[in-house]
Amino acid sequence: MYADNLYAYGPVDGPLTEDLPAQAATRKGQVRTLMAERLLAAHRLGTLQVAIGRSSDYYGPGGANSVVGDVLFGAAAEGKRARWLGRLDVPHSLNYLPDVARALVTLGARSEALGEVWHLPAAEPLTGRAFVGLIAAALGRPVKVTATSRLALRVAGVFDPRARESAEMLYQWERPFVLDASKFQRAFGPLEPTPHRQAVATTVAWFRERAGHTHC
């Protein structure tokens, strides 16, 4: 079972489906494409049994290193200014980590999943502004947020390799980025994703507890 992301597709217009060609426009996307192609080739040869589950950017308890982890949830939990990549006004699919785990377990238990790529179910895509609003509601106070621009990431990338990598993937956050998991739902569903409001509240609680331990 290979847990993958959506980097392989590159910039696309419309929802992301499994039948899109691999047209990665970035180094990270090209690496992911090569890994997936090699795994599927090994499956066809009978060397391995492989199924690939792809999710969008993730969040949830334990997700500090996510692109919306420490810089968004962590900062908000500590009362600091949070950062959102790209535009705040375009919809973006985000997968909740426990839902990703459930879906991967499902794929691992079903022989018909083998040899295929599957998109893992996520709750409805939200704009950055709406997502930050859910964090604020869970915290019970406003959250100050800055939309991080391409220019800002390029400047920061002179000193910070992580900022350079974020700049490379920023196209996902500058236009609608919508995951289509209907293939998974037709084959194995219904698997109902956790509603964002509930998932965000659980994630905020985890980051709050973590911040408390950090400052002890």
Regions found by a protein language model. Give the residues of each.
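Alpha-helical membrane-targeting segments
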Residues: V71-S93, K144-F177
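A structural motif corresponding to the C-terminal end of an alpha-helix
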Residues: M35-Q49
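Short-chain dehydrogenase/reductase
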Residues: G14, E18-P21, A25-E37, S66-D70, ...
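Substrate-positioning beta->alpha
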Residues: A64-V71, L85-G108, G115-V117
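NAD(P)-dependent short-chain dehydrogenase/reductase
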Residues: L45, Q49-I52, S56-P91
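Mid/C-terminal beta-alpha module of Rossmann-like enzyme folds, strongest
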Residues: A103-E165, A181, R186, T194-C216
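Conserved sequence/active-site signature of Rossmann-fold short-chain dehydrogenase/reductase
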Residues: A8, Y58-G60, V100
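Conserved Rossmann-fold NAD(P)-dependent oxidoreductase catalytic core, especially the SDR/UDP-sugar
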Residues: M1-V31, H43, A51
